[in-house]
A protein has these predicted regions:
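Cytoplasmic/organellar membrane-interface segments at the starts of transmembrane helices
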Residues: 84-87, 139-202
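Hydrophobic transmembrane alpha-helices and their helix-loop junctions in integral membrane proteins
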Residues: 1-145
Length: 202
């Protein structure tokens, strides 16, 4: 958890930042399972589903950014939101879901895991909570440097925003994130019986 979060904070490339943050998120899943409670297991499964959607969306947008600009290094970016507002907005939405902001699919997943871990092992729960805070710090910092401010090159000012086909695909990810975040019962009701059975067998 902590290694992935602090390593992500030290990166200067969006792809490497996403790779190290993935390590941190998988660590959170393992911690939820290790709590050996139904809430922890539900949170772990929810987080896995959230991780698949959010990480896929972020890596897809990063790939589209690389296709347009030829680089995902922070030093080559900056001011991207001016010429690519849709791409920047979706990247922010997916990042907020990765941070576990209320209203996104990341919130119920992280809440269940943190609740389960804090009630079963307070020290591990506090470490996980610290990781969530660090995760918010590195994402906001890299997003500000990569997407906000003045454009750093003419390639950025002339870049095209999301096309119709790209917008359709990214929009599907966004819908899944918002539906699962605003109506988490749509996921929890499906996995309730299996998680309860798993806990009972333990």
């Amino acid at each position: 958890l902590l290694y992935g979060a602090f390593a992500a904070m030290a990166q200067t490339n969006l792809r490497r930042m996403l790779a190290f943050s993935s390590i941190s998120h998988v660590g959170l899943v393992l911690l939820g399972i290790a709590a050996f409670t139904q809430q922890g297991l539900q949170g772990a499964i929810f987080q896995l589903l959230n991780f698949v959607v959010v990480s896929s969306g972020l890596f897809l947008l990063t790939g589209l950014l690389h296709h347009r600009l030829g680089s995902t290094d922070i030093i080559s970016l900056g001011g991207t939101a001016r010429s690519m507002p849709l791409l920047s907005a979706f990247f922010l939405l997916f990042g907020l879901a990765a941070m576990g902001i209320p209203g996104t699919s990341g919130f119920p997943a992280e809440f269940l895991i943190l609740y389960a871990v804090i009630t079963t092992h307070t020290g591990a729960g506090l470490a996980a909570l610290a990781t969530v805070i660090v995760g918010a710090a590195y994402f906001i910092t890299l997003y500000r440097r990569a997407f906000l401010g003045p454009a750093s090159s003419s390639a950025i000012t002339q870049a095209d925003d999301l096309q119709t086909r790209e917008l359709f695909i990214v929009g599907l990810f966004a819908i899944l994130i918002l539906v699962a975040g605003l109506y988490p019962a749509s996921v929890l009701n499906v996995i309730d019986a299996s998680t309860q059975g798993w806990i009972n067998r333990l």
